[in-house]
Amino acid sequence: MAMASPAIGQRPYPLLLDPEPPRYLQSLSGPELPPPPPDRSSRLCVPAPLSTAPGAREGRSARRAARGNLEPPPRASRPARPLRPGLQQRLRRRPGAPRPRDVRSIFEQPQDPRVPAERGEGHCFAELVLPGGPGWCDLCGREVLRQALRCTNCKFTCHPECRSLIQLDCSQQEGLSRDRPSPESTLTVTFSQNVCKPVEETQRPPTLQEIKQKIDSYNTREKNCLGMKLSEDGTYTGFIKVHLKLRRPVTVPAGIRPQSIYDAIKEVNLAATTDKRTSFYLPLDAIKQLHISSTTTVSEVIQGLLKKFMVVDNPQKFALFKRIHKDGQVLFQKLSIADRPLYLRLLAGPDTEVLSFVLKENETGEVEWDAFSIPELQNFLTILEKEEQDKIQQVQKKYDKFRQKLEEALRESQGKPG
């Protein structure tokens, strides 16, 4: 015998989930109302345990009748505060919690085991007397005032006490690879002749109209879209190319992350974040392009180049030369730290065969006598006087020998016919 299904509204069975039928009736009678937001009373309400006892059923029916199946009205909630742009991506750290690792640190790889470790081998050091005044140690970066050691092969210069700390091998062990120019230098013609050029006479500064005419003429001859731009205040900007001809090693910080866009904009000095240093040889005749102003001096150009390569050596260790090709010869002239390279570029034109800039070691720097004490200066005078007396004695001995040979020849010729 089939059991007839109960009609809507009848309860022939003792259902315990009594809140559901009213919602079911509401769905049949009209559109379903949205459920009320949970409030504190509903969150703290603990449901009674299920029971089939008649007393429990009657008590539950009485409580439902007293409530009248009325639900409390929803409490007015405060509107959500709108988030500022980029705030949802921000992570909050507990005070004192360790700072997470920089995402760029995942690119730092350990040293390749296939690369052999250098131990400072292959150098042939000899004592050096700096002819042009004090020099710079390639290991510690400090100034060398008196005695120094220099490798006869790679020109590595250091203090005598720094000799045992060198870990960079001599570059001559690599064969002729050190003498080959970099790929960027294949477009330039190199010569082996170096001729000193006399200092040019100072000229009067050009007027604004002359500068404008020279810039227009320069831009018409420039074919690489690297022209100069004139500002309203009379200054102008442009590009120069600097050839790096450094035979001695340079010192850079070790174990730092690459420079980011933020560091470049904020001019963050990453070299100051670590005390670790390492040395290496730059490729010969590498070319670096700089965008400078007409007010940029040679000293600022050198500092900009060192900053681009993250070199921590003293800028006085380097010097900027201008190289001129003329009649198959290469004329080098050291520029003063107050010279304006962009103005020289404007006068010579965009052709690098006429004028080019070279960064080399400052081996012929002027002696800063103010850096020495009185006893040291007196010692220098004593050494110079001794060297002068030695030279005089050598010249005297040389001509004394000539006199003796002439006198012997005259004695032998006496008594002999014609």
Swiss-Prot record:
One of its GO terms (molecular function) is zinc ion binding. A zinc finger (Phorbol-ester/DAG-type) spans 122-170. Residues 1-118 are annotated as: Disordered. The modification Phosphothreonine is found at residue 352. The modification Phosphoserine is found at residues 182, 279. GO terms for cellular component: cytoplasm; microtubule; nucleus. It holds the Pfam family C1_1. Its main location: cytoplasm. GO terms for biological process: apoptotic process; lymphocyte proliferation; negative regulation of lymphocyte proliferation; positive regulation of protein ubiquitination; regulation of protein localization to nucleus; signal transduction. Widely expressed. Frequently down-regulated in lung tumor cell lines and primary lung tumors. Keywords: Acetylation, Apoptosis, Cytoplasm, Cytoskeleton, Metal-binding, Microtubule, Phosphoprotein, Tumor suppressor, Zinc, Zinc-finger. Residues 366-413 form the SARAH domain. Residues 77-89 have a biased composition (Low complexity). It is found in: Cytoplasm; Cytoplasm, Cytoskeleton. Residues 274-364 form the Ras-associating domain. Interacts directly with activated HRAS; a RASSF5-STK4/MST1 complex probably associates with activated HRAS. Interacts with KRAS. Probably interacts with Ras-like GTPases RRAS, MRAS, RAP1B, RAP2A and RALA. Interacts with RRAS2. Can self-associate. Interacts with RSSF1 isoform A. The RSSF1 isoform A-RSSF5 heterodimer probably mediates the association of RSSF1 with HRAS. Isoform 2 interacts with activated RAP1A and ITGAL/LFA-1. Binds STK4/MST1, inhibiting STK4/MST1 autoactivation. Potential tumor suppressor. Seems to be involved in lymphocyte adhesion by linking RAP1A activation upon T-cell receptor or chemokine stimulation to integrin activation. Isoform 2 stimulates lymphocyte polarization and the patch-like distribution of ITGAL/LFA-1, resulting in an enhanced adhesion to ICAM1. Together with RAP1A may participate in regulation of microtubule growth. The association of isoform 2 with activated RAP1A is required for directional movement of endothelial cells during wound healing. May be involved in regulation of Ras apoptotic function. This is Ras association domain-containing protein 5. It comes from Homo sapiens.
